[in-house]
């Protein structure tokens, strides 16, 4: 498979993994390793990045193996998102940022206007910007035109496990994009991840589907395989759907009984 390219970085794995809500730090570490992910995302507001005396998951990982993708979860305005992003960058962890500006506490759907504003401000400051957005086709294009390095449309609401609700819109976003499209949020199981990749997505970001599973480590491995299978299937090119049957064996030369 081809490498996933985001800005100046290249990755072998197309699975991006969130680091929240695992049963324990040990399970989290095992799941991260089982997933094969090379990009790990975390909420800056939930990390003690400037308090070394406080435990956090970064302490138990070999950071030479991973690229960290801080996110601005908790931000309600563009200005809040920018402040959080600056805090992450000041820690020296990474220059990539996942822009997340929530517009509705009940659905956790992103605020399109504030997301666009935050992305523009952060791009001006030299960040590598990956905005979390809805499956709005026009907004996705506007974010790309702004200069975002990848687009991250949601499959369904965060943590809902509903899978891909609108595959048509996702396919439109993917078709028109000239930057990576990473399906983010709502993935419930391996079939959802595989479908996202079969649609042509460049990657999948998930968290709750693994951390909330009965066996997070086993689910992490399942997601790894699903993303790989979906991408291989997309690159191979599936057969077109037809209304009627088509024999899989050649009919030439068959004797008449």
Curated annotation (Swiss-Prot):
Name assigned to this protein: Thiazole synthase
Keyword Cytoplasm: yes
InterPro entries referenced in this protein's UniProt entry, alphabetically: Aldolase_TIM, Thiazole_synthase_ThiG, ThiG
Origin species: Geobacillus kaustophilus (strain HTA426)
Transmembrane segments: none
Family: Belongs to the ThiG family.
Top EC category: transferase
Keywords: Cytoplasm, Schiff base, Thiamine biosynthesis, Transferase
Active site: 98
Record-level Gene Ontology MF annotations: thiazole synthase activity
Pathway: Cofactor biosynthesis; thiamine diphosphate biosynthesis
Domain of life per record: Bacteria
Function of the protein: Catalyzes the rearrangement of 1-deoxy-D-xylulose 5-phosphate (DXP) to produce the thiazole phosphate moiety of thiamine. Sulfur is provided by the thiocarboxylate moiety of the carrier protein ThiS. In vitro, sulfur can be provided by H(2)S.
Pfam families per the UniProt record, alphabetical: ThiG
Keyword flag Cytoplasm: yes
Protein residues bound to 1-deoxy-D-xylulose 5-phosphate: 159, 185-186, 207-208
């Amino acid at each position: 498979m081809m490498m996933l390219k985001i800005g100046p970085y290249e990755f072998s794995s197309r699975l991006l993994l969130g680091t929240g809500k695992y049963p324990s730090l040990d399970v989290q570490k095992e799941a991260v390793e089982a997933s094969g992910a090379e990009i790990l995302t975390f909420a800056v507001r939930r990390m003690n990045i400037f308090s070394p005396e406080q435990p956090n998951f970064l302490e138990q990982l070999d950071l030479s193996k991973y690229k960290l993708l801080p996110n601005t979860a908790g931000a309600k305005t563009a200005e809040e998102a920018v402040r959080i992003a600056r805090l992450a960058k000041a820690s020296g962890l990474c220059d990539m940022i996942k822009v997340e500006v929530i517009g509705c506490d009940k659905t956790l759907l992103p605020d399109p206007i504030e997301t666009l504003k935050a992305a523009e401000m952060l791009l001006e400051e030299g960040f590598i910007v990956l905005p979390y957005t809805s499956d709005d086709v026009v907004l996705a294009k506007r974010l790309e035109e702004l200069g975002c390095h990848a687009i991250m449309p949601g499959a369904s609401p965060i943590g809902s496990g509903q899978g891909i609700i609108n595959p048509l819109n996702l396919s439109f976003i993917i078709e028109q994009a000239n930057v990576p499209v990473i399906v983010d949020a709502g993935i419930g199981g391996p079939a959802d991840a595989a479908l996202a990749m079969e649609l042509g997505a460049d990657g999948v970001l998930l968290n709750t589907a693994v951390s909330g599973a009965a066996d997070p480590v086993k689910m992490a491995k399942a997601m790894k395989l699903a993303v790989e299978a979906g991408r291989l299937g997309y690159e191979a090119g599936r057969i077109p759907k037809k209304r009627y049957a088509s024999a899989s064996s050649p009919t030439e030369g068959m004797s008449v009984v």
